[in-house]
Amino acid sequence: MIGVEPDIAQLVADTLGLKLRLEPTSWENLFRSVDSGQYDIGFSNITVTEERKDKYDFANYRVDTIAFEVRKDSAIQVRQPKDIAGRKVAVGSGTNQEQILLRWDVQNKAAGLPPVQFQYYTNTADYYLALQSGRVDIYVGPNPTAAYHSAVSGDTKIVGQVSGGGEIAAQIAGMTKKGSGLVQPVADALNELIKNGKYAEVLARWNLANEAVPASVVNP
């Protein structure tokens, strides 16, 4: 696995003197597996929300940014809700991105604009195949995924970004089961990495320096 999430997870494990075992999983299974104790912690661009804090503990490590990605030859720009009206938009089911887009869609329909045509797929590869084939106009996902894909593939571009909290700033965090006792050591490790510069090196490697946080806190 490659990306900012496994890189951060590895640094945290190294700082705590733990051996990291990375396991890829679906978005839905991630939460169930943390609930059951199969996974100790989730690092998967998880947005901190008040609802999630009822069941989980969080140690933040990035500002949450959502990206709108289109084909390289597309003239679409996304700056406000009306820019997605009537578009075919691919987004992950049950994600924070979806919740923001659903609110935008309600707002657009109330203004008499055409509804968004939402499309859902099983994995990221399917989303990008749909985008490249023209079955969708826009893919909406985590900024790190979009930034990496657009840079490596050369076939797409980012045409808009918004906070993962919608109208308010949101945080990305490592997620543990509520009361497990792991979240404070994780936050302490992240703060050590922020101090020694290794955290900044990882974000710079993935072109995400603008998503840095000055400190990690528990349940921000």
Where are the model-predicted features located?
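Extracytoplasmic small-molecule ligand-binding "clamshell" domains
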Residues: 1-45, 205
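Bilobed "Venus flytrap"/periplasmic-binding protein-like clamshell domains
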Residues: 2-14, 46, 67-123, 143-145
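Extended ligand-binding regions for polar small-molecule ligands
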Residues: 6-15, 74, 82-83, 87-88, ...
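Alpha-to-beta junction loops
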Residues: 17-19, 36-44, 87-88, 116, ...
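Short helix-initiation/N-cap motifs at beta->coil->alpha
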Residues: 21-32, 76, 116-129
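A ligand-binding cleft/hinge motif common to bilobed small-molecule-binding domains
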Residues: 46-53, 100-107, 132-168
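Periplasmic-binding protein-like
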Residues: 63-70, 151-191, 208-220
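Ligand-binding clefts/hinges and TM-proximal coupling segments of bilobed small-molecule sensing domains
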Residues: 96-115, 159, 190-220
